[in-house]
Amino acid sequence: MHIHKELELTPGQSAPTVGVLALQGGVAEHLAMLESLGAQAVRVRSVADLLGDDGTPAVDALVLPGGESSTMDRLCRTFGLFEPLQRVIHAGLPTLGTCAGLIMLSTRIADPAPGQQSLGVLDVTVDRNAFGSQVDSAEVSLPWSGAAGHAGTDDDAAAAPSGVVRAAFIRAPSVTEVGDGVEVLARYRDTVVAVRQANALGTSFHPELMGETAVHEELLNMVRARG
C-alpha cells in the first residue's frame, strides 16, 4: 500500500477545487482519490459546473475519467461542454485524463468511432483499443518519471527517477505517436502509456482503481505550480 501525501497548504490558502467530468464513466473513484489528497472534488455535468458567471473556470483543475470515449464525446457535445472544455484546457487549466480521458485529450485517434472528435490538447496519436481483450487487461507496476512517485525496489522501476506506480489496464488505449513537446512518463512493454504536455496529463491506465495516488498528486502539483 502506498502512503499518500495530503496537500500542504500555507496559512490562508484554501484547498483546490478539482472538477471531475461526470457525464459517463468511472467518476466516484476519482472523487474519492482527490478528497483523500485534501482537494475539494466536485462533479462537472454542465457548463455552469465548469464556468463561473464571468466565464472563467469555476474549478482549479479537471479530471476526465475512464469510460467509453465516443459516448463521452457525444454527451459533451449534447450538453454544450465540448467547446468550453476545449477552451479552458487550452488556456492552461491543469487537466488529467485517464483511459477514455486520455483519448479525449489526444489530437489524433487512430481508430475513431463514427463522428468521434477529440479535444486536441495532447500532441499524440492514440489507439483506442490497444489493450482491448481480457488477456491484455492487467494490473502491473510501472516505472514512473513524474515528480510525484513512490520509491520501490521492483526490478521494473530501476530506471524510474521517481519510482513506480500501480496501474490497472482495462480495455485501455495506448499512445502510438508522440509529438516533440510531449514528455513520456511511463511505458508498459515498450508502449507509451502516460504522457504530459504543458498543463495536460494523460494515462492509458486507471490509477484510481489501484489506490495509486501518484498521478493525482502530479495533477495537484500542477495546480500548485500554477499559483
Residue ranges, per PLM feature:
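Gly/Ser/Thr-rich beta-alpha loop segments that engage phosphate groups in nucleotides
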Residues: 21, 27-28, 68-69, 103, ...
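Short coil/turn connectors at secondary-structure junctions
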Residues: 15, 58-59, 91-93, 116-117, ...
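A secondary-structure boundary/capping signal
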Residues: 23, 98-100, 122, 171, ...
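Amide-donor transfer/coupling interface in amidating biosynthetic enzymes
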Residues: 1-11, 128-136, 141-227
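N-terminal beta1-alpha1 cap of cysteine-dependent amidohydrolase-like domains
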Residues: 1-78, 83-91, 213-217, 221-227
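Cysteine-nucleophile active-site neighborhood
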Residues: 68-149
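Structural motif
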Residues: 63-65, 96, 202-204
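Hydrophobic anchor at the start of a short beta-strand
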Residues: 41-42, 95, 200
